[in-house]
């Protein structure tokens, strides 16, 4: 059974295409929009188009940034350690590290990981741009590359690939520690993580 | 900590204003929009504005309908019993009844219920429009009003108010049955519902 309005149906269909939004949620969102002032709908509509029109990738780190702020605020930031680059898979990972307010180096966003099964090879993600940043003529002051990809098979594969490419350049390659999360109980940690935590033990 | 793009922040803020969408979900939706082709964002943006611009209330039943389909498809539908009007609180309730494909009469959408605590009186919902439909000169063929408001205090109050207004017009006023839902187990039904079910028992 369909709504009595084609415009509402179209809105429900459009909402239902978003990830994690089913028909029922889409219907509730559509009814909410109908009840709100037009200004609210306009705000969301223009934010959608602005995000597509104004957001570009930073020419240095490939993270998302505004068209009029390229290079991005992190790449041009004062007090950033220009000699360390943390390599991540996607922009949300940059946000996660920035929230810690602990890491002070730069980033490089690959926008994906090597995944042969999905047809994604080294040339499909921003590896070339990373190597470009490591060339001596580009300032050449990079001392360390921190690999911070997700602990999946594809992430590990990409880390291995990158380390083999970068090590010959005489730059230190590290990866973030795998171990038990803060606040977790040993009893409920999976075997793989426990093994990694044991392997990676440090002096007290 | 904020994203490196003001446009993305604006989109996250706009998404987060939707009901049931928190910051994390809004962030995921925004990243999804960034990865989709521009056409998808355009489709949602224009659906939002169309819903505000093209959707009006049916001049008869007050349900939502397209500007170019007023009176709505139900009010003008063939094979609809013009002598029964089901009074509901909101457009989603019409949809719920239409999904049953069982009820064949007309509807009247109040767009709210009387709720003195929220400052909503009888004049703030579409009661006047309902009474207008019951006037003899308006065709005057309405035989029965079915009250199908939600079983809340406000819904019951509104039902009582309507029944007192309409009964003097010589029109039958009924309300939908309260009882145990199909498929429920008696053991887990609350006392109020069980009492209503017992009161409303019918011959087998």
UniProtKB/Swiss-Prot annotation, chains A, B:
The keyword Metal-binding applies. Residues 83-181 form the Toprim domain. GO terms for molecular function: DNA binding; zinc ion binding. Coiled coil: none annotated. PANTHER family: RECOMBINATION PROTEIN RECR. This is Recombination protein RecR. May play a role in DNA repair. It seems to be involved in an RecBC-independent recombinational process of DNA repair. It may act with RecF and RecO. The gene is recR. Belongs to the RecR family. A zinc finger (C4-type) spans 58-75. PROSITE patterns: TOPRIM. It comes from Chlorobium phaeovibrioides (strain DSM 265 / 1930). InterPro entries: DNA_Rcmb_RecR (IPR000093), Rcmb_RecR (IPR023627), TOPRIM_dom (IPR006171), TOPRIM_RecR (IPR034137). The keyword DNA-binding does not apply. CDD domains: TOPRIM_recR. Keywords: DNA damage, DNA recombination, DNA repair, Metal-binding, Zinc, Zinc-finger. It comes from the Bacteria. One of its GO terms (biological process) is DNA recombination. Transmembrane segments: none annotated.
């Amino acid at each position: 059974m369909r709504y009595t309005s084609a415009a509402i149906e179209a809105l429900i269909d459009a909402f239902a295409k978003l990830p994690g939004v089913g028909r029922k949620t889409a219907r509730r969102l559509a009814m909410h929009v109908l009840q709100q002032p037009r200004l609210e709908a306009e705000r969301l509509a223009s934010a959608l188009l602005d995000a597509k029109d104004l957001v570009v990738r930073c020419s240095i780190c490939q993270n998302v940034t505004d068209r009029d702020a390229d290079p991005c605020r992190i790449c041009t930031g004062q007090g950033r350690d220009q000699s360390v680059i943390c390599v991540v898979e996607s922009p949300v990972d940059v946000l996660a590290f920035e929230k810690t307010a602990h890491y002070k180096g730069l980033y490089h966003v690959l926008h994906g990981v090597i995944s042969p099964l999905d047809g994604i090879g080294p040339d499909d993600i921003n590896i070339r741009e990373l190597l470009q940043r490591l060339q001596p003529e580009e300032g050449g002051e990079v001392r360390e590359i921190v690999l911070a990809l997700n602990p999946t098979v594809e992430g590990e594969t990409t880390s291995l690939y990158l380390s083999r490419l970068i090590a010959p350049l005489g730059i230190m390659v590290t990866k973030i520690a795998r171990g038990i999360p803060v606040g977790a109980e040993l009893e409920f940690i999976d075997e793989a993580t426990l093994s990694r935590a044991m392997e990676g033990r440090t002096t007290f």
